[in-house]
């Protein structure tokens, strides 16, 4: 089966990496909207247009299902995409429910880091209210992380200083989970792990998203790991340049290392 994965940029490679670990016999189309990244500070109308352009492109190129591997696009566009397109559309959702289910100490909180659009959006707030977790959840927008990720600036002093400056706003000893509410943030798990107290676990929504994809399409987890069959597109143009393909390969290799950090 041909499956499309769409993100504003290269953050969604973390979702592709998760998909390849479980569904290696399937074909994937990965669409990175690099001309318009980042989405986190764009208007709602802009994000809707970009999302429809991307998903329609993937469907036109044979995708039988599409994963919107972008929390910001999911927050803004998922309802409209599902209402107007006939293929299954799987969205991202910050792993707040997972953190809520795993937490065994009512005195400790969950910190969700995401883009400004996701943090201020109704979808995340509705999720928190439905879980009755408003008093146990704090939100923090980290817009610069997306730009760092797109530049492949993962471990610089600029990144570490930025994270420390933002996270110092919270008494981290009062938290037990940090939820990555943006797929770009998976690149920074090592830097986050250095800053966070040992008792704070890092979780993301990638595994849950691919589980939903498998369930909705009735797929089976691959019994063997085959060579990935993936075509990459930058805002509708197939990526053929060797240097760009090598960059994507390096990013996937880094994300595979980051999967082990929690």
From Swiss-Prot:
What task does this protein carry out?
A: Provides the (R)-glutamate required for cell wall biosynthesis.
Catalytic residue list: 70 (proton donor/acceptor), 182 (proton donor/acceptor)
Gene Ontology terms, MF aspect: glutamate racemase activity
Q: What Enzyme Commission number(s) appear in the record? A: 5.1.1.3
What species is given as this protein's source?
A: Campylobacter concisus (strain 13826)
Pathway where this protein functions: Cell wall biogenesis; peptidoglycan biosynthesis
Which chemical reaction does it catalyze?
L-glutamate = D-glutamate
Q: Which UniProt keywords apply?
A: Cell shape, Cell wall biogenesis/degradation, Isomerase, Peptidoglycan synthesis
Provide the protein name. Glutamate racemase
InterPro entries named in the record: Asp/Glu/hydantoin_racemase (IPR015942), Asp/Glu_race (IPR001920), Asp/Glu_racemase_AS_1 (IPR018187), Glu_race (IPR004391)
> Looking at its record, which EC class is this enzyme?
isomerase
């Amino acid at each position: 089966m041909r499956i499309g994965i769409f993100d504003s940029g290269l953050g969604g490679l973390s979702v592709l990496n998760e998909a390849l670990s479980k569904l290696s016999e399937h074909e994937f189309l990965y669409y990175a909207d690099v001309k318009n990244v980042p989405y986190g500070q764009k208007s709602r109308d802009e994000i809707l247009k970009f999302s429809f352009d991307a998903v329609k492109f993937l469907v036109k190129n044979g995708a039988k299902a599409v994963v919107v591997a972008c929390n910001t696009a999911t927050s803004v566009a998922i309802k409209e995409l599902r209402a107007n397109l006939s293929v299954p559309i799987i969205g991202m959702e910050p792993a707040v429910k997972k953190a809520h289910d795993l937490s065994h100490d009512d005195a400790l909180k969950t910190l969700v880091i995401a883009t400004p659009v996701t943090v201020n959006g109704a979808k995340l707030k509705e999720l928190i209210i439905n879980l009755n977790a408003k008093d146990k959840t704090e939100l923090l927008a980290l817009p610069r992380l997306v730009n760092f990720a797109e530049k492949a600036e993962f471990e610089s002093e600029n990144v570490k200083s930025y994270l420390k400056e933002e996270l110092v706003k919270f008494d981290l000893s009062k938290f037990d989970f940090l939820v990555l509410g943006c797929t770009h943030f998976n690149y920074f798990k090592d830097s986050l792990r250095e800053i966070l107290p040992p008792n704070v676990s890092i979780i993301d929504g990638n595994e849950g998203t691919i589980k939903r994809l498998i369930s909705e399409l009735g797929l089976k987890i691959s019994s063997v790991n085959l060579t990935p069959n993936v075509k990459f597109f930058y805002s509708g143009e197939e990526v053929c340049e060797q240097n760009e393909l090598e960059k994507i390969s390096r990013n996937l290799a880094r994300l595979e290392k980051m999967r082990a950090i929690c």
